Amino acid sequence: SNVIAGVRSAAAELSDSGGSAAASAIMTTDTYAKEAVAHGTGFTVGGMAKGSGMIHPQLATMLAVLTTDYPLEAGEAIEFLRPAVDTSFNAISVDGECSTNDTVILLANGASGVARTPETDEEFAASVRKVCGELAKHIVVDGEGATVLAQIAVRHAMSEPEARAIAERVATSPLVKTALYGHDANWGRIAAAAGSAKFNGGFAHLDPDRLSIAIDDVPVLVDGRPTGDEPPLTNGHCAIEIDLALGDGSANYLTTDLSYDYVKINAEYRT
């Protein structure tokens, strides 16, 4: 009865300007409301999301709702949403932890009346990707206790699935994440994590003598040999590029550091 009453109360407050209020209402440990928008030719895609901890692909405490006035037929939304989710919400991790209630929804009412063509469909797909990407980045930036946003790029892996496995392994490595918190350009931890990425019952291909790593565009390992250079990592952002020199596979991932505050937040949290 409380749920029904709550739904009725919320419905009574529906308005054209209610999006920001809704984005604030769904917050839990978030420190700010997360919204994004993309304007296409005659249509709009907007979105809101919540999430800060227990963020990892497939099952996490994340909610995202996208709305659009682009005309879609029943069942078509997934064709645009799934590819966008695969490169955004399914390519982020704050703590590698999972739950059972993540949701990404795309709602379309067709109110724009735009005449659909292959070109407008592609523009719409790009708009959905943009909104998903911005919301996913907001979630990582606002990760529980996060002080560093890390962008991980894996290049020239044996295949794209292997590149993704390596990127995810590095993104979820506690040793890599604590090194980020300590502003330590520790290529050894990155290489060790990459080399232990599980794939197809074994491990992703990696040749230590061909491995190169750059941190904030500074080469720290080239063909398996350390350069001795050490970027400062002091601006709250870190770009890690891992080049395996084995094939054409590539993948991108967003993650955070692991701080004292993350431990404090989750040690004090009670359900």
What do the PLM-derived regions correspond to, one by one?
Residues 1-271:
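A structural signal for small-residue-enriched, beta-sheet-centric alpha/beta enzyme cores
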